[in-house]
Amino acid sequence: MKTLLLTLVVVTVVCLDLGYTRRCYNQQSSQPKTTKSCPPGENSCYNKQWRDHRGSITERGCGCPTVKPGIKLRCCESEDCNN
C-alpha cells in the first residue's frame, strides 16, 4: 500500500511539473534567436515594436509591459509565442 501511494505521488509530481516556467524569445530586432526561462509566476511573453531614426525596432521578453502610444505590443501565453 505504501509503495502504491509513493508511486502515485511521484507520478503526480512528474505530470504536474511543479517547477514549470514559461519560456519566451528574448532577442532584440535582428539578433539571432535566443530564449530565456521566465521567473516563476510570469506566464506571458511579449513582442514590442516601434520605429525610430534607426528604423524598425523589436523587443521581446517575459511579461506583458505597459507601452506608450505608437508602440505595437503583442502579448501571448504559450511557449516561444512571441517571435
Curated annotation (Swiss-Prot):
<feature type="disulfide bond">
    <location>
        <begin position="64"/>
        <end position="75"/>
    </location>
</feature>
<comment type="similarity">
    <text>Belongs to the three-finger toxin family. Short-chain subfamily. Type I alpha-neurotoxin sub-subfamily.</text>
</comment>
<dbReference type="InterPro" id="IPR018354">
    <property type="entry name" value="Snake_toxin_con_site"/>
</dbReference>
<keyword id="KW-1015">Disulfide bond</keyword>
<dbReference type="GO" id="GO:0005576">
    <property type="term" value="C:extracellular region"/>
</dbReference>
<dbReference type="GO" id="GO:0099106">
    <property type="term" value="F:ion channel regulator activity"/>
</dbReference>
<keyword id="KW-0732">Signal</keyword>
<dbReference type="InterPro" id="IPR054131">
    <property type="entry name" value="Toxin_cobra-type"/>
</dbReference>
<feature type="disulfide bond">
    <location>
        <begin position="38"/>
        <end position="62"/>
    </location>
</feature>
<keyword id="KW-0964">Secreted</keyword>
<feature type="disulfide bond">
    <location>
        <begin position="76"/>
        <end position="81"/>
    </location>
</feature>
<keyword id="KW-0800">Toxin</keyword>
<keyword id="KW-0629">Postsynaptic neurotoxin</keyword>
<protein>
    <recommendedName>
        <fullName>Short neurotoxin II</fullName>
    </recommendedName>
</protein>
<keyword id="KW-0528">Neurotoxin</keyword>
<dbReference type="InterPro" id="IPR003571">
    <property type="entry name" value="Snake_3FTx"/>
</dbReference>
<dbReference type="Pfam" id="PF21947">
    <property type="entry name" value="Toxin_cobra-type"/>
</dbReference>
<feature type="signal peptide">
    <location>
        <begin position="1"/>
        <end position="21"/>
    </location>
</feature>
<keyword id="KW-0008">Acetylcholine receptor inhibiting toxin</keyword>
<keyword id="KW-0872">Ion channel impairing toxin</keyword>
<feature type="disulfide bond">
    <location>
        <begin position="24"/>
        <end position="45"/>
    </location>
</feature>
<dbReference type="GO" id="GO:0030550">
    <property type="term" value="F:acetylcholine receptor inhibitor activity"/>
</dbReference>
<dbReference type="GO" id="GO:0090729">
    <property type="term" value="F:toxin activity"/>
</dbReference>
<dbReference type="InterPro" id="IPR045860">
    <property type="entry name" value="Snake_toxin-like_sf"/>
</dbReference>
<comment type="function">
    <text>Binds to muscle nicotinic acetylcholine receptor (nAChR) and inhibit acetylcholine from binding to the receptor, thereby impairing neuromuscular transmission.</text>
</comment>
